[in-house]
């Protein structure tokens, strides 16, 4: 699946005026010309790539041609970089554009780097492997971003058999994953709903079943187990932190192993509360704005600044793409740091820093804007978040169409809303969710 992000002005009117020269929403994915879709040379070139990885090459070529792009930047996580040269060759062969690969580390959707792409002279950015989480700055009408989710097909038969051998019938299961496996996850949910009480929870603006390392839904009390489809534990730990009382399982689609997973909630929370307690006696604060792509939120930074000013606390601002203990040790006069980048950096690695390294939520607790929450909130990009120390706080309160759920609410059986007006043509609009079976 892919999503195209364009400037607001260009999308609303274009050269032909408002509403003209634009196809109805939901039909964009079907507009790829047959001379691209059925091009035998292109089909042969695509076969070099793994058949179970959907890089959406025809759509990418069509979008580049539509935009008349001259220089295209590709951004992808390190796990996909081995395919970058092949994709460059294909795109340069079938378009008129010059294509380059951005090699800086890309941890997630928050790292989409349109700033660097523009600085390098690109007029089109293709971001692979993540969903359209960050609305783009619409001030530049000559720059476009295409998100390619890189849907990965796996052996669902083995997954289903593993679940059936592990859980008795009628067990209430919640299924979650990363964006690459969401379509497989929802197909599996449809297969299981006749035997189990299956839910695919949604934490808007994410897709149904999608979780991030910093954002996961709170599950209903009826859920007896949560199953994560994916490799590694980073995303799984997010939903485990948000739901400490729900047994968690991980199905690795590569090793084909279903395992019971555990997390030391007591140790993590004790470490974070100790950091908060130390911060309450701090005289000098340091505010770090992450500059790795769009990771940092200026809105959150401004909120923190206003709170510190109101309390008469001194602070210094620091812009960093990567946050290391050795870097922060160069400013010994700072008593406590608050990083507006990735909450998991503090949660997972906070004890490695000599001074407290707080998340914006933890800073709010230290400043007594909110009490310590149980369970620990994983709502950094959720629309229905706790407060202005999160990215999308208040989006669920905006007016919405009658009969449609407000953004940010956890819903069953609803399709993903666009992250912004610019994402209206996102093909994930057609995703389905398996509701909780009776």
UniProtKB/Swiss-Prot annotation:
Outcome after substituting residue 384 to R: In breast and ovarian cancer
Q: What is its main location?
A: nucleus
A biological process term (GO) from this entry: fibroblast proliferation
Instruction: Kindly state the tissue distribution recorded for this protein.
Output: Expressed in heart, brain, placenta, lung, liver, skeletal muscle, kidney, pancreas, spleen, thymus, mammary gland, colon, small intestine, testis and ovary. Reduced expression in primary breast and ovarian tumors.
Report the domain of life of the source organism.
Eukaryota
Q: How is the cofactor bound?
A: Binds 1 [4Fe-4S] cluster per subunit. The cluster is coordinated with 3 cysteines and an exchangeable S-adenosyl-L-methionine.
Tell me the GO molecular function terms: 2-(3-amino-3-carboxypropyl)histidine synthase activity; 4 iron, 4 sulfur cluster binding; metal ion binding
Q: Which residues form a coiled coil?
A: none
Sorted keywords for this record are: Cytoplasm, Disease variant, Dwarfism, Ectodermal dysplasia, Hypotrichosis, Intellectual disability, Iron, Iron-sulfur, Metal-binding, Nucleus, S-adenosyl-L-methionine, Transferase, Tumor suppressor
Q: What is the effect of changing residue 120 to P?
A: In DEDSSH1; impairs diphthamide modification of elongation factor 2
Q: Which locations, inside or outside the cell, does it occupy?
A: Nucleus; Cytoplasm
Catalysed reactions, as listed in the record: L-histidyl-[translation elongation factor 2] + S-adenosyl-L-methionine = 2-[(3S)-amino-3-carboxypropyl]-L-histidyl-[translation elongation factor 2] + S-methyl-5'-thioadenosine + H(+)
* Clinical disorder: Developmental delay with short stature, dysmorphic facial features, and sparse hair 1: An autosomal recessive syndrome characterized by intellectual disability, short stature, and craniofacial and ectodermal anomalies including scaphocephaly with or without craniosynostosis, prominent forehead, sparse eyebrows and hair, hypoplastic toenails and, in some cases, dental anomalies.
UniProt similarity note: Belongs to the DPH1/DPH2 family. DPH1 subfamily.
Query: What does it do?
Result: Catalyzes the first step of diphthamide biosynthesis, a post-translational modification of histidine which occurs in elongation factor 2. DPH1 and DPH2 transfer a 3-amino-3-carboxypropyl (ACP) group from S-adenosyl-L-methionine (SAM) to a histidine residue, the reaction is assisted by a reduction system comprising DPH3 and a NADH-dependent reductase. Acts as a tumor suppressor.
Oligomer status and interactors: Component of the 2-(3-amino-3-carboxypropyl)histidine synthase complex composed of DPH1, DPH2, DPH3 and a NADH-dependent reductase. Interacts with DPH2. Interacts with RBM8A.
What is this protein called in UniProt? 2-(3-amino-3-carboxypropyl)histidine synthase subunit 1
Species classification: Eukaryota, Metazoa, Chordata, Craniata, Vertebrata
């Amino acid at each position: 699946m892919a999503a195209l992000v364009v400037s607001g002005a260009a999308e609303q009117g274009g050269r032909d005026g408002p509403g003209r020269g634009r196809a109805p929403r939901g039909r964009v994915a079907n507009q790829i010309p047959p001379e691209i879709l059925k091009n035998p040379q292109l089909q042969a070139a695509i076969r070099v790539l793994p058949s179970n990885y959907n890089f959406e090459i025809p759509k990418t070529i069509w979008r580049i041609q539509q935009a008349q792009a001259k220089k295209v930047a590709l951004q992808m996580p390190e796990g996909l970089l081995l395919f970058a040269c092949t994709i460059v060759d294909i795109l340069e062969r079938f378009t008129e554009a010059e294509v380059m690969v951005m090699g800086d580390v890309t941890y997630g959707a928050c790292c989409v780097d349109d700033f660097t792409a523009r600085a390098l002279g690109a007029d089109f950015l293709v971001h692979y492997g993540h969903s359209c989480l960050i609305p783009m700055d619409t001030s530049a009408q000559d720059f476009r971003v295409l998100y390619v989710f890189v849907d990965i097909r796996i052996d669902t038969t083995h997954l289903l058999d593993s679940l059936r051998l592990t859980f008795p019938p009628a067990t209430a299961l919640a299924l979650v994953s990363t964006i690459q496996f969401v379509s497989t996850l929802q197909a599996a949910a449809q297969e299981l709903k006749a035997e189990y009480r299956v839910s695919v929870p949604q934490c808007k603006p994410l897709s149904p079943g999608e979780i991030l390392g910093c954002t996961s839904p709170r599950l209903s009390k009826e859920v007896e187990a949560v199953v994560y489809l994916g490799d590694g534990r980073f995303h799984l730990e997010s939903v485990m932190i948000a739901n400490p009382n729900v047994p968690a399982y991980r199905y690795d689609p590569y090793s084909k192993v279903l395992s019971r997973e555990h997390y030391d909630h007591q140790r993590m929370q004790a470490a974070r509360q100790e950091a908060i307690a130390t911060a309450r006696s701090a005289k000098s604060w340091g505010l770090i704005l992450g500059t790795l792509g769009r990771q940092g939120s200026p809105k959150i930074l401004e909120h923190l600044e206003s709170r510190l000013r109101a309390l008469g606390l001194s602070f210094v601002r620091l812009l960093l793409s990567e946050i290391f203990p050795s870097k922060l040790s160069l400013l010994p006069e700072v008593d406590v740091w608050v990083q507006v980048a990735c909450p998991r950096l503090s949660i997972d690695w906070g004890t490695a820093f000599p001074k407290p390294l707080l998340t914006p939520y933890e800073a709010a607790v230290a400043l007594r804007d909110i009490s310590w929450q149980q369970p620990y909130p994983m709502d950094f990009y959720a629309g229905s978040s706790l407060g202005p120390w999160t990215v999308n706080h208040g989006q669920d309160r905006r007016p919405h169409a009658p009969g449609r759920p407000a953004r940010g609410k956890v819903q069953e059986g609803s399709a993903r809303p666009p992250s912004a007006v610019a994402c209206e043509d996102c093909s994930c609009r057609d995703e389905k969710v398996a509701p909780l079976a009776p």
